[in-house]
Amino acid sequence: MASRYVAVGMMLSQTVVGVLGSFSLLLHYLSLHYIGCRLRSADLIVKHLIAASFLTLLCKGVPQTMAAFRVRYFLNAIGCKLVFYLHRVGRGVSTGTTCLLSVFQVITVSSRKSRWAKLKEKAPKHVGFSVLLCWILCMLVNIIFPIYVTGKRNHTNITVNKDLGDCCGRGNNKIAQTLRAMLLSFPDVLCLGFMLWASSSMVCILHRHKQRVQHIHRSNLSPRASPENRATQSILIPVSTFVSSYTLSCLLQVCMALLDNPNSLLVNTSALMSACFPTLSPFVLMSCDPSVYRLCFAWKR
């Protein structure tokens, strides 16, 4: 009984904090538009990341909280299909836009003499198309979920279905479950690889730039960190947060796919880890965005 209340409290807290963070970041961009600041091309990616995080939190947090409260049959078959599908799409777009943001940043910070010189000028023009393509691909890849998931009120024979809280998954074929888990994990693994490559490339570029201007920093007596160090922190903090949370989430998702009837602890832990990055990402992005501090000074003036 106590563990159920702990699960309810954690899910509610995570959902509320994540939604408030998403609204705060959205309000931040609206405030920048209000005071006349020109938004960057990367801000469009961040806006879609906010939308995907918000979608993930609502579609995972609310049903899991209702299931933890033991509200039976909160969702019917159509509701289960829609909620699981939107959650997977939001999760995929969150992964894809974070990866896209990392790749866009490495193209932006690269020098004009590098092999990314041609992409440096074209990249801002194709940000919108890239984000739209990310949404379309996630919708197509996760189309299997409306076929696989259904509501418990429509299927009382739980022995042939996988328990997913208020919903259930059809079938218990081990081979099909393994293939499905590999198919759904492949885009996440691919995005993680691109993200690690982009982040390491950016850190190397900033380190080389710092070495070139080392004599300038030696003459600067200010105790503040160099711009390269601050930029490196703004790169590594979001990526490390994403990689750690989504790696654990992917492992738990694979375990749930391979088990016939995962217990409530595994289901609740997987739900918490799935919403971990969407909850933290608005605060991480705001802490690493210098425009937040410019906005604060603008309001003070």
Swiss-Prot record:
It comes from the Eukaryota. The chain crosses the membrane at residues 16-36, 49-69, 89-107, 127-147, 186-206, 235-255, 265-285. Glycans are attached at N154, N157. Keywords: Cell membrane, G-protein coupled receptor, Glycoprotein, Membrane, Pheromone response, Receptor, Transducer, Transmembrane, Transmembrane helix. Residues 37-48, 108-126, 207-234, 286-301 are cytoplasmic. It is found in: Cell membrane. GO terms for cellular component: plasma membrane. It is a multi-pass membrane protein. Coiled coil: none annotated. InterPro entries: GPCR_Rhodpsn_7TM (IPR017452), Vmron_rcpt_1 (IPR004072). GO terms for biological process: response to pheromone; sensory perception of chemical stimulus. One of its GO terms (molecular function) is pheromone receptor activity. Gene3D superfamilies: Rhodopsin 7-helix transmembrane proteins. Residues 1-15, 70-88, 148-185, 256-264 are extracellular. Belongs to the G-protein coupled receptor 1 family. PANTHER family: VOMERONASAL TYPE-1 RECEPTOR (PTHR24062). This is Vomeronasal type-1 receptor 4. The gene is VN1R4.
